[in-house]
Curated annotation (Swiss-Prot):
Bidirectionally degrades single-stranded DNA into large acid-insoluble oligonucleotides, which are then degraded further into small acid-soluble oligonucleotides. This is Exodeoxyribonuclease 7 small subunit. Heterooligomer composed of large and small subunits. The keyword Hydrolase applies. It is an enzyme of class 3 (hydrolase). Its EC number is 3.1.11.6. It comes from Maridesulfovibrio salexigens (strain ATCC 14822 / DSM 2638 / NCIMB 8403 / VKM B-1763). InterPro entries: Exonuc_VII_S, Exonuc_VII_ssu_sf. One of its GO terms (biological process) is DNA catabolic process. It is found in: Cytoplasm. It catalyses: Exonucleolytic cleavage in either 5'- to 3'- or 3'- to 5'-direction to yield nucleoside 5'-phosphates. Belongs to the XseB family.
Amino acid sequence: MTKDNKTFEDRLDRLKAIVSALEKGDLPLEEGVALFKEGQTLSKECATQLEKARNEVKIVTGGEVEDFDVDTEEDTADDS
């Protein structure tokens, strides 16, 4: 699969795997740096894809896109 054919989810899954590997802290320096660089690239690509999706939603909704709050487990625990 070429880079251009990867979905947002593919990139996000790879980014999560990279973060997990880096958090373990047992990689050789060179491998850690290479993974960090790959992660930076993936992060930028995901941000670009999200911005494109947001712009598409703006077009479909006539420019009326409102931000919304996403309840997290912490948010719902704080409400109790």
